C-alpha cells in the first residue's frame, strides 16, 4: 500500500478549533512548510483555505484533525468542493522540542503525519448520515436522562413521608412514574414537606414522560430515514431501525472503509493475533467503535434466539468445544462481513442520492 507522500505533491494539514482553523501547506517530497494561515470557522474562512491550496498547484490532499467535531464544517465544505480529505483521529505525537506547542506546529504535524501513513480514513459525510447521527444522539440523551430521573424519583419515594410513600407501595418504578404524574400537591398544603415532595415527584414524573415521548419520536424519525436510505438493512435477521442506524452512521458511505476486514476492525470484532513461537492464539479486540460493536452483539443475540441457521451453527460450534462467549465472537465477525458486503453493494439511484445530496 503506497504512502500518501507517493500520491500527492502537497498536503494541507489543518488544526481545528471552535473559532479558528490553522493550516500548513507541506510539500510531499521534502516535508518542508511552504505556507501557513489561520482563518475563522465560517464560509469565508473555508474559502480562504481553498484559495491557499489553489496557490500551490499539483495533486493535493487536506489532512484534518477533528473532522467529526470542530472540523466538521470544513470537512463538508472541502468535500463539496471536490477536495481529497483524510481524517486524523489519533495522530502520532512526537516528543515536543523544548515543550513546543502551538496551532501552527500542530497543523504541520498533522500534514507530516498524514504523509507517513499508508492507511488514511476519510471523514464521515452525507446529509442522511448526519441526520441519523443527530437523531441517534438526541434519542440516546433522552433515554439516559429519563433513566436518571426515574432513579431520582425512586430514591425520593423511598425517603418520602409515610403518607406519600404509602401511595407508591408495591409499585414498580414505571408504575411510580404514572402515579406521580397524577399527584395533586395542593392536597397536602398543610404539610410543607409532603407538599414539596409531591410537587417534585409530579415534576419528575412528567419530565420522564416527556423524555420518553421525545425518544419515541426520534425513533420514528430514525426508522423513516433508514427505510428511505438503506431499506435492505432492515430485511436482515436481527436488524431493527436503531441497530441499522448505528451501522450506517459508523460506515457512512461506500469506499470509506476499504475492506470487510477493516470494517470488522472498526467494529472491534476482528481478533488480535497474539501468537509467539509455536503458540497460536488471539486476543479479544477491545478497541474500535463500541456502539457498532454493541449493534453486532444485539444482532448476534437476536439470531441466537430466533434464527434457525444461527442456532444450528451455535450447536455445531459447541460440539467442537467452543464456549458460548467464543461462539458470539465468531458470529459478530461473520455479521460484520455480511453487513459490509451489503452496504458496499450497489443500491437504487434514489437511495444512493439521499446521502449524496
Where do the language-model regions lie?
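Glycine-rich, often acidic, oxyanion-interacting loops/wings at catalytic, nucleic-acid
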Residues: 135-232, 356
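Short, basic/hydrophobic alpha-helical segments
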Residues: 44-61
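Low-complexity, acidic/Ser/Thr- and charged residue-rich accessory regions of DNA metabolism proteins
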Residues: 277-278, 282, 314-357
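Short glycine-rich, Thr/Ser-proximal phosphate-binding strand/loop in the N-terminal lobe
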Residues: 18-44
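Short glycine-rich phosphate-binding loop at a beta-alpha junction
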Residues: 58-70
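Phosphate-backbone recognition surface of nucleic-acid-processing proteins
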Residues: 102, 235, 241-320, 324
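Gly/Thr-rich phosphate-binding beta-strand-loop-beta motif of the actin/hexokinase/Hsp70
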Residues: 2-27, 110, 142
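Short alpha-helix plus adjacent loop in nuclease-associated cores
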Residues: 79, 85-123, 130, 134, ...
Amino acid at each position: 500500500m503506497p504512502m500518501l507522500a507517493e500520491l500527492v505533491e502537497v498536503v494541507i494539514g489543518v488544526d481545528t478549533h471552535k473559532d479558528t482553523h490553522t493550516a500548513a501547506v507541506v510539500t510531499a517530497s521534502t516535508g518542508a512548510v511552504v505556507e501557513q494561515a489561520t482563518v475563522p470557522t465560517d464560509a469565508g474562512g473555508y474559502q480562504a483555505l481553498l484559495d491557499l491550496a489553489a496557490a500551490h498547484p499539483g495533486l493535493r490532499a487536506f489532512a484534518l484533525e477533528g473532522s467529526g467535531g470542530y472540523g466538521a464544517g470544513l470537512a463538508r465544505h472541502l468535500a463539496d468542493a471536490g477536495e481529497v480529505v483524510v481524517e486524523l483521529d489519533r495522530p502520532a505525537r512526537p516528543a515536543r522540542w523544548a515543550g513546543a506547542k502551538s496551532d501552527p506546529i500542530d497543523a504541520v504535524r498533522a500534514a507530516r503525519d498524514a504523509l507517513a501513513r499508508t492507511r488514511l480514513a476519510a471523514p464521515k459525510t452525507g446529509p442522511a448520515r448526519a441526520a441519523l447521527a443527530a437523531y441517534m444522539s438526541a434519542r440516546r440523551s433522552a433515554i439516559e436522562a429519563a433513566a436518571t430521573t426515574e432513579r431520582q424519583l425512586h430514591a425520593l419515594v423511598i425517603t418520602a413521608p409515610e403518607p406519600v410513600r404509602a401511595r407508591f407501595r408495591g409499585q414498580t418504578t414505571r408504575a411510580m412514574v404514572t402515579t406521580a404524574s397524577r399527584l395533586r400537591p395542593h392536597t397536602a398544603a398543610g404539610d410543607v414537606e409532603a407538599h414539596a415532595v409531591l410537587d417534585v415527584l409530579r415534576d419528575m414524573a412528567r419530565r420522564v414522560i416527556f423524555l420518553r415521548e421525545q425518544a419515541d419520536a426520534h425513533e420514528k424519525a430514525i426508522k423513516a430515514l433508514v427505510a428511505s436510505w438503506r431499506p435492505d438493512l432492515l430485511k436482515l435477521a436481527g436488524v431493527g431501525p436503531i441497530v441499522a442506524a448505528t451501522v450506517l452512521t459508523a460506515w457512512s458511505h461506500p469506499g470509506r472503509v476499504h475492506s470487510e476486514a477493516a470494517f470488522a476492525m472498526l467494529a472491534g470484532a476482528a481478533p488480535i493475533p497474539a501468537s509467539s513461537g509455536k503458540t497460536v492464539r488471539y486476543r479479544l479486540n477491545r478497541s474500535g467503535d463500541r456502539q457498532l460493536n454493541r449493534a453486532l452483539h444485539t444482532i448476534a443475540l437476536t439470531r441466537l434466539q430466533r434464527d434457525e441457521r444461527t442456532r444450528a451453527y451455535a450447536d455445531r460450534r459447541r460440539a467442537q468445544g467452543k464456549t458460548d462467549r467464543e461462539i458470539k465472537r465468531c458470529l459478530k465477525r461473520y455479521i460484520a462481513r455480511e453487513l459490509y458486503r451489503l452496504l458496499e453493494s450497489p443500491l437504487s439511484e434514489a437511495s444512493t442520492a439521499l446521502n449524496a445530496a
